[in-house]
């Protein structure tokens, strides 16, 4: 007994539209504890869609379709489904009435081609669309097979899923067990290194632990399958706490917590402020810090010191040091951090200077070399050398630089 997602639309195959519907539905199925092993994207082609239905209907009990429900000629999902199951389409007057009301409320005239949206296979139930004009269907064309169709518009699909599909599935006995997960987030450690530290947890069966990696960050998803969220939390908590203990400072937060929100919380708790001086990131660090609502409580501002003259005039960087060591150096990073801290009167000053590329690198200072400077309220100033590699593009280096600088600040805040 499993579900399968079928997303219909040539625009998805061409990459013109991000397929966020499949991501949403996959998460929802996991949350409901409904097994889900396959997803398919197929273009607006009846014969290929029939092939997909043939395969999916022989391996899944619930087929969930998105897309292809509109009034245009390429909207073929409903009629293809009906044709596959040799069932006639029947016009539903209640759908016509609903569409007429919606068009009138919007001050528009309903054209004849919209009547196509009122055609459903004989015996199918209407899956109401509160937001749009294209309803879906809820149908059991044969025993042990349920079909649900949704528009491709994400807002409409989500509303229909939440208001109609979920209650139906639960009423049918699906979703008696839920899968509840907590995502633990780590920085400053690679996926393989973290996996080696916590490898014994990968053999657990309930909860399970699975690693994921993204740019500059590693995550561990701890998931439990139980009858209630409370039971799941009771299983997850001790495992999550042990993982955090093993990781130490490499662990920074969980679920929706971001590095910026965690740093902001610590600064707010301590009643401290921070300012930034940026060169190669050109405001990237300030942007990350201010992505958190209420960041004005602790973020005073920043100086983008891209040109060396700005480093000297606004941050007080020694011109002789610039000449001797270059802008990309530990001593300049330290002076930038101290300079912005003093200039803006904050407890902490953070600086970034480096070679983002693709040009500008040398044998001694290659693309990807970045220095992060930190100055604290106790007068201590230090810097950290980061080498992100010559193979990474400019935006990756800039992003890694901003988040690495923020993570250095987090660690210093926690140990001071």
UniProtKB/Swiss-Prot annotation:
Entries under InterPro entries matching the protein: CinA, CinA-like_C, CinA_C, CinA_KH, Competence-induced_CinA, MoaB/Mog-like_dom_sf, MoaB/Mog_dom
Gene3D superfamilies: 3.30.70.2860, CinA-like, MoaB/Mog-like domain
SMART domains: MoCF_biosynth
Domain of life: Bacteria
NCBIfam families, alphabetized: cinA_nterm, molyb_syn, PncC_domain, PRK00549.1
HAMAP family in the cross-refs: CinA_B
Family affiliation: Belongs to the CinA family.
Protein name: CinA-like protein
Species name: Rippkaea orientalis (strain PCC 8801 / RF-1)
Taxonomic classification: Bacteria, Bacillati, Cyanobacteriota, Cyanophyceae, Oscillatoriophycideae
């Amino acid at each position: 007994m499993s579900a399968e997602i079928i997303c219909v639309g040539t625009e998805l195959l061409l990459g013109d539209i991000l397929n966020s519907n499949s991501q949403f539905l996959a998460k929802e199925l996991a949350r409901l504890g409904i097994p889900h092993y396959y997803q398919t994207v197929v273009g607006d082609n009846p014969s290929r869609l029939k092939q997909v239905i043939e395969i999916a209907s022989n391996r899944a009990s619930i087929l969930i379709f998105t897309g292809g429900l509109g009034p245009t000629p390429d909207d073929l999902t409903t009629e293809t489904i009906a044709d596959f199951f040799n069932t006639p389409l029947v016009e539903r007057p209640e759908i016509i009435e609903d569409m007429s009301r919606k068009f009138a409320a919007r001050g528009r005239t309903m054209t004849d081609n919209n009547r196509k949206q009122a055609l459903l296979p004989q015996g199918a139930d209407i899956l109401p669309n509160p937001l749009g004009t294209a309803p879906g269907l809820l149908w059991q064309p044969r025993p042990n097979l349920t079909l649900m169709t949704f528009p491709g518009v994400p807002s409409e699909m989500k509303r229909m899923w939440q208001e109609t599909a979920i209650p139906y599935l639960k009423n049918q006995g699906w979703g008696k067990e839920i899968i509840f997960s907590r995502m633990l987030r780590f920085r400053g450690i690679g996926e393989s290194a973290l996996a080696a530290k916590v490898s014994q947890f990968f053999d657990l069966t309930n909860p399970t632990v699975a690693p994921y990696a993204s740019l500059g960050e590693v995550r561990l998803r701890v998931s439990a399958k139980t009858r209630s969220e409370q039971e799941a939390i009771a299983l997850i908590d001790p495992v999550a706490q042990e993982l955090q203990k093993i990781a130490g400072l490499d662990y920074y937060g969980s679920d929706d917590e971001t590095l910026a929100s965690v740093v902001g919380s610590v600064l707010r708790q301590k009643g401290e402020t921070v300012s930034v001086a940026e060169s190669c990131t050109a405001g990237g660090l300030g942007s990350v810090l201010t992505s958190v609502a209420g960041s004005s409580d602790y973020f005073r501002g920043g100086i983008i010191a891209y040109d060396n003259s700005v480093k000297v005039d606004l941050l007080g960087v020694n011109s002789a040091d610039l000449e001797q060591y270059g802008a990309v150096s530990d001593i300049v990073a330290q002076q930038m951090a101290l300079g912005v801290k003093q200039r803006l009167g904050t407890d902490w000053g953070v600086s970034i200077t480096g070679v983002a590329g693709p040009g500008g690198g040398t044998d001694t200072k290659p693309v990807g070399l970045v220095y992060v400077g930190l100055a604290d309220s106790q007068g201590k100033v230090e810097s950290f050398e980061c080498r992100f590699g010559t193979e990474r593009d400019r935006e990756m280096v800039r992003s890694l630089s901003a988040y690495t600088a923020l993570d250095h600040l987090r660690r210093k805040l926690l140990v001071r």
